[in-house]
Every structure is written in C-alpha cells, then in structure tokens.
C-alpha cells in the first residue's frame, strides 16, 4: 500500500485558544495514538492532507516532525466543519510493520458482467472491504472480477479471497449482483402481452369458422 508523508510539528499547547490560532493559520490539529506514553499532539498544514482525505483511495501515513521523530500511522478519525467542510481535527494511530492492522480497502471491479451485456444492471452492495493484514501486504485496492456474472447471480466476499489479508466480513456477504433492469422487464411484459393477444385472436377465429361449418351441415 502506498504511503503519504505528512510534515508537522509538535504542539506546545492544546488549549482551545491555541487550537483556534492554529486553524486560523491554516494548520490542522492532530493527535497520534498508540505511541508510548501519552498521545502525541502535533499540527500540519491543511493542504498536506489533500491526497489523504479528498480521495477514494486509502494510504498509510508517514508522520515526520520538525524535531526529528518519524512515525508510521493510519488515519483513524477526521472531523469536518459542518458548513465549510474544512478539516477541523484528525486522529491517527501508530502502526508497526510486524503487527497486523485492520483497514477498509476500496473495491475495483474488473470486466463486464455477462448479465449486463444481456440487459441487466450491476448493483453494488459494498464499495469497500474491511480486511486485516500486515501493512506491507495490504493492497491499494481489491480487484473483483464480475465478467462471469449472469442476471440474478451475486459475487460474494469469498470470491476475492487473498493470502495477503483476512476479510472481516461473513462469507455470505455480497459485494455486487446483476439484477434485471426495469427497461428489460417492461420489454418482456410487452412481448408477453403481444403473444397473449395473438393467442386469443387466432384460435378463436378458427373455432368460430369450424362451428359455423358444422351448424350449416346440420341444417342440410
């Protein structure tokens, strides 16, 4: 998995006044958990989080402080301003290469489902999978091949198993499925109506003609 570097500096004060001053200066107050002792409070420029926050992708983080310390981490929580969507606060959690971590990884579909080619629609139940594994083994995204799915068929999480991570969902969890589209249903209904009309009209005419002939023969 790709890693993004965040350059920051330790916070000398964590009070409300100091936090407000940081935000006014374009800085984001952050906390790193999982370190020895107390959580580490630091701040970094808001623009440095652009490729970490405003993206559908996920990354690990390398936090580098001006004092020289460096930490590997993952984003744990983020708070946004309710009106401006500006980043108010970010929590990180320190990770270690030899210890497994749990993350939500994006799903990328591959191929065109057979059912879609026949008029169906691919519906997603999940866009990300929660998996657990070593940081170095976790992928940037998980590939889900849907090319063999027919209308009515589903792709389960067991279809994207990997030796590199353990999926944290029940085996019967559905990633996506091919369903009949509304247009296809309407078209099939119209075809059935036409068949019913034809079936009602033709046999009725033949029966009426035969009955008329027999009736004429009886009178003679």
From Swiss-Prot:
GO terms for cellular component: cytosolic large ribosomal subunit. Keywords: Ribonucleoprotein, Ribosomal protein, RNA-binding, rRNA-binding. Residues 211-220 have a biased composition (Basic and acidic residues). The keyword rRNA-binding applies. One of its GO terms (molecular function) is structural constituent of ribosome. GO terms for biological process: translation. Residues 186-199 have a biased composition (Acidic residues). It comes from the Bacteria. Part of the 50S ribosomal subunit; part of the 5S rRNA/L5/L18/L25 subcomplex. Contacts the 5S rRNA. Binds to the 5S rRNA independently of L5 and L18. This is one of the proteins that binds to the 5S RNA in the ribosome where it forms part of the central protuberance. Belongs to the bacterial ribosomal protein bL25 family. CTC subfamily. This is Large ribosomal subunit protein bL25. It comes from Christiangramia forsetii (strain DSM 17595 / CGMCC 1.15422 / KT0803).
């Amino acid at each position: 998995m790709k890693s993004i570097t965040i350059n920051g500096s330790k916070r000398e004060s964590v009070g409300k006044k100091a936090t407000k001053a940081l935000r006014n200066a374009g800085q984001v107050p952050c906390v790193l958990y999982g370190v020895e002792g107390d959580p580490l409070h630091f701040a970094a420029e808001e623009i440095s989080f652009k490729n970490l926050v405003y993206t559908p992708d996920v990354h690990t983080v390398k936090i580098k402080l001006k004092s020289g310390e460096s930490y590997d981490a993952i984003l744990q929580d983020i708070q946004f301003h309710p009106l401006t969507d500006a980043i108010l606060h970010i929590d990180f959690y320190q990770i270690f290469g030899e210890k497994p971590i749990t993350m939500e990884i994006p799903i990328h579909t591959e191929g065109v489902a057979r059912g879609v080619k026949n008029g169906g629609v691919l519906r997603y139940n999940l866009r990300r999978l929660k998996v657990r594994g070593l940081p170095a083994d976790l992928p940037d995204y998980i590939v889900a091949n849907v090319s063999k799915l027919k209308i009515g068929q589903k792709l389960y999480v067991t279809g994207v198993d990997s030796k590199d991570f353990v999926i944290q969902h029940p085996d019967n969890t559905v990633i996506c499925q091919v369903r009949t589209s509304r247009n296809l249903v309407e078209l099939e209904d119209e075809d059935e109506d036409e068949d019913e009309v034809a079936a009602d009209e033709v046999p009725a005419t033949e029966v009426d003609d035969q009955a008329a002939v027999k009736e004429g023969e009886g009178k003679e």
